[in-house]
UniProtKB/Swiss-Prot annotation:
Name this polypeptide is given: Cytochrome f
Gene: petA
Family, as annotated: Belongs to the cytochrome f family.
Annotated membrane topology: Single-pass membrane protein
PROSITE patterns linked: CYTF (PS51010)
Native source organism of the sequence: Synechococcus sp. (strain WH7803)
Length: 310
């Protein structure tokens, strides 16, 4: 029941926020959740990159190894210059939001809150986690949340226990991480947002630039054969052409207002067998004891030699 309510609650939060704050700059892992069965394509690309076209650095920190049934932190870092705003849906300057997705190995899940340490509770304050879907509890989403407060997002992760799940085995596992800052350039419907470059629809001369609806500009280009095509530029991007300018098809007619972007990476974690650790510790103890015995034996031998006057 809790898993069912989590995505519904996330949808309610996003829906209310969209209606009440249309000018805010969003990073929407939620949209990927609604449009793709899996957040990762067969090629390895995380689907967020289909809407967030700019590539930006994303980093991740996870322990090298973890024990079964233990809670550890997977930290996703989404660095960017917080002093630079971007263009909101209404054309105003707004601070960037961030979002992240962590695809854990099968069996690894978001740790239950009753197992969070005080440090984890403090580090995750203001962060809401949701599972990608009911049948993928190992895929965890965060966002959108204010980027200036969350350039590092801590994911509390619970490791599985092979002793209670026969499908889980000790060994090395891959973790896929994606991090985004700012709005996308394309909506899931395929339409451009106002956070991207607009280009000339044909080769020709800019015949007119007229005001459109909601602050948009309609740029009309006349081809050499007299054909006219128009491109509607929404409020936000700045025009870089004027009436009478010659343009090539596909050439930019606006600046690029986007300052955000998406990045992904793969990392690894080892689910360590505690018996091997105990065996290793016992081996180290045996080696240390053997060295001590050798030292004591050597000193005893030296004393005997000294007593015999050798």
């Amino acid at each position: 029941m809790r898993r069912l309510l989590s995505p519904l609650f996330a949808a309610l939060i996003v829906g209310v926020t969209v209606l009440t704050a249309p000018s805010t700059s969003w990073a929407y892992p939620f949209w990927a959740q609604q449009n793709y069965d899996s957040p990762r394509e067969a090629t390895g690309k995380i689907v967020c990159a289909n809407c967030h076209l700019a590539q930006k650095l994303t980093q991740a920190e996870v322990p090298q190894s973890v024990l079964p049934d233990s809670v550890f932190k997977a930290v996703v870092k989404i660095p960017y210059d917080t002093s630079v705003p971007e263009i909101g849906a209404d054309g105003s300057e707004v601070p960037l939001q961030v979002g992240a997705v962590v695809m854990l190995p099968d069996g690894f899940t978001l740790a239950p809150q009753d197992r969070w340490t005080d440090d984890i509770k403090e580090e995750t304050e203001g962060v809401y986690f949701s599972e990608y879907s009911d049948d993928q509890p190992n895929v965890i989403l965060v966002g959108p949340i204010p980027g200036d407060q969350h350039q590092e997002i801590v994911f509390p992760v619970l490791s599985p226990d092979p002793a209670t799940d026969s499908n889980i085995h000790f060994g090395k596992y891959s973790i896929h991480v994606g991090g985004n800052r700012g709005r996308g350039q394309v909506y899931p419907t395929g339409e451009k947002s106002n956070n991207t470059v607009f280009t000339a629809p044909s080769t020709g001369t800019v015949r007119s630039i007229e005001a459109g609806e909601n602050g948009a500009s309609v740029v009309t280009i006349a081809s050499a054969d007299g054909t006219e095509l128009s491109e509607t530029v929404p409020v936000g991007p700045a025009l870089i052409v004027s009436v009478g300018d010659a343009v090539e098809a596909g050439a930019p007619i606006t600046n690029d207002p986007n300052v955000g972007g998406f990045g992904q990476l793969d990392t690894e974690v080892v689910l360590q067998n505690p018996v091997r650790i105990y065996g290793l510790l016992a081996f180290f103890a045996a080696v240390a004891l053997a060295q001590i015995m050798l030292v004591l034996k050597k000193k005893q031998f030296e004393k005997v030699q000294a007593a015999e006057g050798v």
